[in-house]
């Protein structure tokens, strides 16, 4: 990896407008922060990004399944060893169940080590007579409702880098150091089935997985792949000063990569075809995703393919659909049909979270577990009818026992939300709800064969 200022400085079109960017009050402080980031070592390597691209190509071809999960918005305070371990543990547990249900390898991607910024509907928030800048994630400002806390501070971008580095260090230690051993993960899942009041429903599948592992052990099969896993990082490429400052020229190929994460996506609110985010995504060689909401037209989808993957490189482009449970069965089919007919190679992933948010009577933002599940069901039904591959799921989750989404086997109610509502932004599935979803999606994967 090299950082060649001449080629990088001319890489991106500076004349384009960028949506959802903070109004940094101190331009010289921003310049200093960007200069510091430009001098930092890469958080990931281009070769790792290429490996992920190859895995995504397999998933797009129906030979793997994508599991992406993590916080809605990471916070500096929650970047603790326990919190990171619990999130990884939850994703590994989900992956083991999905892998068995699908009889396919599962690509494990954390929505972590960089997901510190969020787009907002309004630039300002008003409480009583006081109006302050909206909270845009720890990358920009602080959740506390004071003028100093809400003033965008570019030094936070440097803190994002260091916190992401520490997170990735733990991720690598946990996934390569024996913590991710498939047999250990299965023991955790057995514990979930035994201890959870909804576990009985999933006991049969857990027992099947146990018998399969016992059979392999009896046959002397103990591959290294059981002991370690590849775990990739991802986040929304939102704050362009950060993403551009961490773009490097790969010394092997001379091509630019965003080395802040293996995979980045462009959000529903920033995917303007003539905008700076789309220009950024076009120029980097990482595998990239684009969020597609219910207003997406066929023309939008086909134009994005043409702009972002003109050579139809397998693994380059992932469409993450966020339609809402009530829309997915009507809006998704024409999009999938048109893209398939065009011959484009795209991985289709379902985000069943963002189209299903509503405000509870108490004022908390929440989501119904049944809506989340129904959108995934609709996603699978659409692909089943069209003969295409339901390539993966994108879930906002935590490894902790929070009470942010209602329903599920624990029957969390609107009245329970206040018990442990900890998210910095949108509501997340807790550990139990995440595992319950994995078992239910595993049943869908098994039934689709």
PLM features: residue spans?
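Short loop/turn segments at strand-loop or loop-helix junctions that form parts
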Residues: 67-72, 109-112, 350-353, 396-398
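A general structural signal for short secondary-structure junctions and capping/turn motifs
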Residues: 56-59, 97-99, 280-281, 382-386
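N-terminal basic/disordered segments at the start of proteins
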Residues: 2-66
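Non-transmembrane, aqueous-exposed alpha-helical and coiled segments at domain scale
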Residues: 301-304, 310, 316-348, 354-403
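Short coil-to-beta-strand
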Residues: 62-63, 348-350
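Active-site-facing alpha/beta catalytic cores
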Residues: 74, 79-324, 367, 375, ...
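C-terminal structured domain segments
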Residues: 407-408
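Glycine-rich, charged/polar anion/phosphate-binding loops
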Residues: 51-53, 274-277, 304, 333-335
């Amino acid at each position: 990896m090299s950082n060649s200022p001449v080629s990088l400085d001319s890489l991106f079109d500076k004349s384009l407008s960028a949506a959802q960017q903070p109004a940094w009050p101190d331009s010289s402080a921003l310049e200093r922060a960007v200069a510091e980031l430009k001098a930092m070592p890469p958080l990931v390597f281009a070769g790792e990004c290429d490996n992920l691209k190859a895995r995504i190509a397999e998933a797009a071809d129906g030979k793997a399944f994508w599991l992406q999960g993590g916080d809605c918005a990471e916070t500096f305070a929650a970047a603790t060893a326990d919190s990171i371990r619990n999130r990884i543990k939850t994703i590994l547990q989900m992956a083991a169940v999905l892998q068995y249900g699908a009889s396919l390898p599962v690509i494990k991607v954390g929505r972590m080590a960089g997901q510190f910024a969020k787009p907002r509907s309004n630039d300002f928030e008003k409480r009583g007579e006081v109006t302050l800048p909206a909270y845009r994630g720890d990358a920009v400002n602080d959740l506390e409702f004071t003028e100093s806390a809400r003033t965008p501070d570019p030094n936070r971008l440097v803190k994002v880098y260091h916190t992401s580095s520490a997170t990735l260090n733990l991720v690598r230690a946990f996934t390569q150091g024996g913590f991710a051993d498939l047999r250990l993960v299965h023991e955790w899942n057995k514990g979930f089935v035994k201890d959870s009041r909804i576990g009985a429903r999933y006991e049969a599948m857990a027992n099947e997985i146990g018998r399969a592992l016992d059979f392999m052990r009896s046959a002397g099969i103990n591959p290294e792949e059981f002991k370690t896993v590849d775990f990739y990082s991802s986040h929304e490429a939102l704050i362009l000063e950060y993403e551009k400052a961490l773009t490097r020229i790969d010394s092997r190929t001379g091509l630019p990569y965003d080395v802040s994460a293996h995979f980045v996506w462009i959000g529903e609110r920033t995917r303007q075809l003539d905008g700076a985010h789309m220009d950024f995504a076009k120029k980097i060689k990482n595998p990239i995703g684009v969020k597609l909401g219910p207003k997406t037209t066929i023309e939008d989808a086909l134009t994005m393919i043409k702009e972002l993957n003109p050579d139809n490189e397998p693994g380059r482009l992932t469409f993450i659909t966020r339609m809402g449970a009530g829309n997915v069965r009507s809006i998704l089919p024409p999009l999938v049909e048109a893209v398939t007919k065009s011959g484009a190679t795209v991985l289709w992933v379902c985000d069943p979270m963002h189209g299903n948010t509503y405000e509870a009577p108490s004022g908390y933002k929440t989501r119904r577990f049944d809506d989340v599940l129904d959108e995934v069901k609709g996603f699978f039904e659409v692909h089943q009818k069209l003969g295409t591959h339901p390539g993966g799921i994108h879930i906002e989750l935590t490894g902790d026992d929070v009470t942010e989404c209602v329903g599920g086997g624990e029957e969390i109610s609107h009245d329970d939300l206040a018990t442990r509502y900890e998210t910095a932004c949108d509501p997340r599935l807790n550990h139990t709800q995440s595992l319950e979803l994995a078992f239910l999606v595993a049943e869908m994967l098994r039934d689709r064969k």
